[in-house]
């Protein structure tokens, strides 16, 4: 009975060590992933702002043209 408890304790100990090593590797990989994700998010927001600015400019030009034609001042 005692030898069975010792072997189970050794297996548990080895499993815990291997699990902690895997978690450390995973955390190291996630740290690298966070940097690229932040960069992607930065690029995405930049493209989004450029797109919004372009749409606002186009909408403003369209509204100016429509108001000119409605008022017949063109």
Curated annotation (Swiss-Prot):
Q: Decide whether keyword Cytoplasm is in the record.
A: no
Tissue expression from the record: Expressed by the skin glands.
What's one GO BP annotation on this UniProt entry? killing of cells of another organism
Q: Which domain of life is it from?
A: Eukaryota
Per the UniProt entry, the disulfide pairs are 68-74
* Cellular-component GO terms for this entry: extracellular region
Has UniProt tagged this entry with the keyword Cell membrane? no
Which positions make up the signal peptide? 1-22
InterPro entries the record matches = Antimicrobial_frog_2, Frog_antimicrobial_propeptide
Q: Matching Pfam families, A to Z?
A: Antimicrobial_2, FSAP_sig_propep
Q: Where in the cell is it found?
A: Secreted
Q: Which UniProt keywords apply?
A: Amphibian defense peptide, Antibiotic, Antimicrobial, Cleavage on pair of basic residues, Cytolysis, Disulfide bond, Fungicide, Hemolysis, Secreted, Signal
**Any chance you could tell me the propeptide residue ranges?**
23-39
Briefly, what is this protein's role?
A: Antimicrobial peptide. Active against a variety of Gram-negative and Gram-positive bacterial strains. Active against fungi. Shows hemolytic activity against human erythrocytes.
Spell out the family assignment given in the record's similarity comment: Belongs to the frog skin active peptide (FSAP) family. Brevinin subfamily.
**What is this protein's name?**
Brevinin-2MT1
Q: Which organism is this protein's natural source?
A: Amolops mantzorum (Sichuan torrent frog)
Organism taxonomic ancestry: Eukaryota, Metazoa, Chordata, Craniata, Vertebrata
